[in-house]
Amino acid sequence: MAAMRWRWWQRLLPWRLLQARGFPQNSAPSLGLGARTYSQGDCSYSRTALYDLLGVPSTATQAQIKAAYYRQCFLYHPDRNSGSAEAAERFTRISQAYVVLGSATLRRKYDRGLLSDEDLRGPGVRPSRTPAPDPGSPRTPPPTSRTHDGSRASPGANRTMFNFDAFYQAHYGEQLERERRLRARREALRKRQEYRSMKGLRWEDTRDTAAIFLIFSIFIIIGFYI
C-alpha cells in the first residue's frame, strides 16, 4: 500500500521532471514528495499541480479549496464509480492533494517550493489507522456472513453504500438553502410585477372608458343647448 501511494505521488507531483534532470530522490516509500526540499530557484517546480487537480486557482481561499475537495470526492468516489481503477486513483490523488492544500502550513510551504517528506510525516498529517499488511505474512480471508437460507454471502454483501444525498446535504446544504430562498424571492418579485402590470392595465382601461363617456356627455349637453 505504501509503495502504491509512492507511485501515485510520483504521478501527481511535477517533481518527476526534477528527477529526470538528475536531482536526488528519496527512496523511502512515504507520501512521496522526496526528502529534498525545493527552493524558489528550481525553475521546473510547479506550484499549481495540486491546485489544478482540485480545479481551483492558486489564489483560492481555504473554504474554496474545501468545497472543491468535496465536489471532486463526490464525482470520483469509488462507490459512485464502481469498478473504475482510474476513478479510484483520481480519488486517492485528490485526497492526497487536500492533505497539503487543506493545511495552511503545508500549503504555504508548497507554494514556496519548500515542502518535504518530513513535513508530510509531521503531526499535522493524519496517518492511516490501518497499517499496511506485510507481503510475507499469510493473509486471513475476510469473514463471510450467512444468509437466511444458510448460503454464504460475499464479503462485500454487508458493505454500507455511500449516501450521496447525505453527503451533498452536509457539505452543500447551506448553499442549496440560499439558492432556494433566492428563487423564492425572484418568484415573489415576478408575481408582484405581474400584479402591478395587470392593475395598471385595468386602470388604463377604466381611464379610457371614463374619458370617452365624458366626451360623449359633453356632446349631448351641447346638443341640447343648440
UniProtKB/Swiss-Prot annotation:
Changing residue 51 to C: In LHONAR1; results in reduced turnover of N-module subunits of the respiratory chain complex I and reduced complex I activity in homozygous patient-derived cells. Residues 1-38 form a transit peptide. Residues 49-114 form the J domain. GO terms for biological process: ATP biosynthetic process; brain development; regulation of mitochondrial ATP synthesis coupled proton transport. CDD domains: DnaJ (cd06257). It comes from the Eukaryota. It is a single-pass membrane protein. Residues 116-157 are annotated as: Disordered. The chain crosses the membrane at residues 208-225. Residues 130-144 have a biased composition (Pro residues). Changing residue 78 to S: In LHONAR1; results in reduced turnover of N-module subunits of the respiratory chain complex I and reduced complex I activity in homozygous patient-derived cells. Gene3D superfamilies: DnaJ domain. It is found in: Mitochondrion inner membrane. It is linked to DNAJC30 is located in the Williams-Beuren syndrome (WBS) critical region. WBS results from a hemizygous deletion of several genes on chromosome 7q11.23 thought to arise as a consequence of unequal crossing over between highly homologous low-copy repeat sequences flanking the deleted region. WBS is an autosomal dominant disorder characterized by multiple clinical manifestations including neurologic features such as intellectual disability, cardiovascular, urogenital and skeletal features, and distinctive facies. Leber-like hereditary optic neuropathy, autosomal recessive 1: An autosomal recessive form of Leber hereditary optic neuropathy, a mitochondrial disease resulting in bilateral painless loss of central vision due to selective degeneration of the retinal ganglion cells and their axons. The disorder shows incomplete penetrance and male predominance. Associates with the ATP synthase complex. Interacts with MT-ATP6; interaction is direct. Interacts with ATP5MC2; interaction is direct. This is DnaJ homolog subfamily C member 30, mitochondrial. It comes from Homo sapiens (Human). The lineage of its organism: Eukaryota, Metazoa, Chordata, Craniata, Vertebrata.
